[in-house]
């Protein structure tokens, strides 16, 4: 698969990114090189190889929860520019 400048422009639009002409050219080349490398990986013979999600065996190491004293509401809000009834007040984001 070949990455085109149109592909880069489309992805930039979806990500709401404004790219310069130089960035569009540079990213087109970089992404094309990455996909070419991935295509080479597809040529590997993986018959008999067990699919894994990690290259090395990984196990979850859980620990018991510890109840500890909290810093308290007053300390947590001490440097807050604005607060109401024990909560941070932030500017409205959605009208």
Curated annotation (Swiss-Prot):
Gene3D superfamilies: Glu-tRNAGln amidotransferase C subunit, N-terminal domain. One of its GO terms (biological process) is glutaminyl-tRNAGln biosynthesis via transamidation. One of its GO terms (molecular function) is glutaminyl-tRNA synthase (glutamine-hydrolyzing) activity. Its EC number is 6.3.5.-. Keywords: ATP-binding, Ligase, Nucleotide-binding, Protein biosynthesis. It catalyses: L-glutamyl-tRNA(Gln) + L-glutamine + ATP + H2O = L-glutaminyl-tRNA(Gln) + L-glutamate + ADP + phosphate + H(+); L-aspartyl-tRNA(Asn) + L-glutamine + ATP + H2O = L-asparaginyl-tRNA(Asn) + L-glutamate + ADP + phosphate + 2 H(+). InterPro entries: Asp/Glu-ADT_sf_sub_c (IPR036113), GatC (IPR003837). It comes from the Bacteria. Heterotrimer of A, B and C subunits. NCBIfam families: gatC. Allows the formation of correctly charged Asn-tRNA(Asn) or Gln-tRNA(Gln) through the transamidation of misacylated Asp-tRNA(Asn) or Glu-tRNA(Gln) in organisms which lack either or both of asparaginyl-tRNA or glutaminyl-tRNA synthetases. The reaction takes place in the presence of glutamine and ATP through an activated phospho-Asp-tRNA(Asn) or phospho-Glu-tRNA(Gln). Belongs to the GatC family. This is Aspartyl/glutamyl-tRNA(Asn/Gln) amidotransferase subunit C. It comes from Geobacter sulfurreducens (strain ATCC 51573 / DSM 12127 / PCA).
């Amino acid at each position: 698969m070949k990455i085109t400048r149109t592909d880069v422009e489309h992805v930039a639009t979806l990500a709401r990114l404004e790219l310069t002409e130089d960035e569009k050219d540079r990213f087109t080349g970089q992404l094309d090189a990455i996909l070419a490398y991935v295509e080479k990986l597809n040529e590997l013979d993986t018959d008999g190889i067990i699919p894994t999600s990690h290259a090395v065996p990984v196990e979850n190491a859980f620990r018991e929860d510890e109840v500890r004293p909290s810093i308290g509401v007053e300390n947590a809000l001490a440097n807050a520019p604005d607060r109401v009834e024990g909560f941070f007040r932030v500017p409205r984001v959605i009208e």
